[in-house]
A protein has these predicted regions:
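Nucleotide-state-sensitive switch-loop elements of NTP-binding domains
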Residues: 4-27, 32-35, 40, 45, ...
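Generic alpha-helical hydrophobic packing signal
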Residues: 65, 116-117, 163, 209, ...
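G-domain G4 guanine-recognition motif of GTPases
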Residues: 42-43, 67, 71, 144-145, ...
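Conserved C-terminal guanine-recognition region of P-loop GTPase G domains, centered on the G4
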Residues: 129-136, 143-194
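Canonical P-loop GTPase G-domain recognition
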Residues: 172-229
Length: 229
């Protein structure tokens, strides 16, 4: 019992320290007028593919930077750098999530005054990422049609904390036989207050709604308004 209490106390201390650092990140981001978006999902849900399209299509409209978290390799960072955006790769080693201290270190690689939007592509994980505030304004959860209709019910904490849930790879919906009404219902059950979008980075379907959402949230940041209403 003593050991269990010690573990709980250590975890609470770690999360408390992370919360302090996240608050400092948030203060710094707001001083620069930045909209910061934390993108989370399981591996393979399409985070990098969506960011590739976003960087291409919003070039000249928003100044975008990206921080990419992975256990190993800089593959995703190189893909995004090819789109002309400033990108910093965060290699976490064995850590299954990003934390506020990693973001603070990565911030030093950017000229934040030259950015409008900062995307944080979190490590592909549906559990740990939900617990760590990074200083972001918005939490976006991606969920592909290939993952099964009940994914939101199996991992409710992540979905419950989302401001926006994006159903990705909708061009594959018919091929995989997914029950889209069930997908929507399960998202709504776990994330009743979240906005829901459906899109395909491959075909382009639904991307305009994503871009409109981003631009509206950026306007709110610059005007000091609340997000994701």
């Amino acid at each position: 019992m003593e050991t269990r209490r010690w573990v709980v106390e250590v975890n609470q201390a770690l999360l408390g320290k992370n919360t302090e650092l996240a608050a400092r990140n948030r203060e710094r981001f707001r001083a620069h007028g930045l909209l910061v978006v934390n993108i989370m999902s399981a591996p393979g849900s399409g985070k990098t593919a969506l960011l590739e399209r976003t960087l291409n299509d919003l070039r000249g409209k928003l100044r975008i930077g990206v921080q990419v978290g992975d256990l190993q390799t800089d593959n995703d960072a190189r893909r995004l750098s090819d789109r002309g955006a400033p990108v910093v790769q965060i290699v976490t080693g064995g850590c299954c999530h990003l934390d506020a201290s990693m973001i603070a270190q990565a911030n030093e690689k950017f000229d934040l005054d030259q950015l409008d939007v900062l995307f944080i592509e979190n490590v592909g994980n549906l559990v740990c990422t939900a617990s760590y505030d990074l200083g972001e304004d918005l939490r976006v959860v991606l969920f592909s049609v290939t993952e099964g209709e009940d994914k939101p019910l199996k991992y409710p904490v992540l979905f419950r904390k989302a401001d926006l849930v994006i159903v990705t790879k909708i061009d594959l919906a018919e091929a995989v036989g997914v029950d889209m009404p069930a997908v929507r219902e399960n998202i709504r059950r776990t994330a009743p207050d979240a906005t829901i979008l459906e899109l395909s980075a491959r075909s382009g379907d639904g991307l305009d709604a994503w871009y409109e959402f981003l631009c509206e949230q950026f306007r709110r940041e610059r005007n000091g308004q609340d997000f994701a209403d």
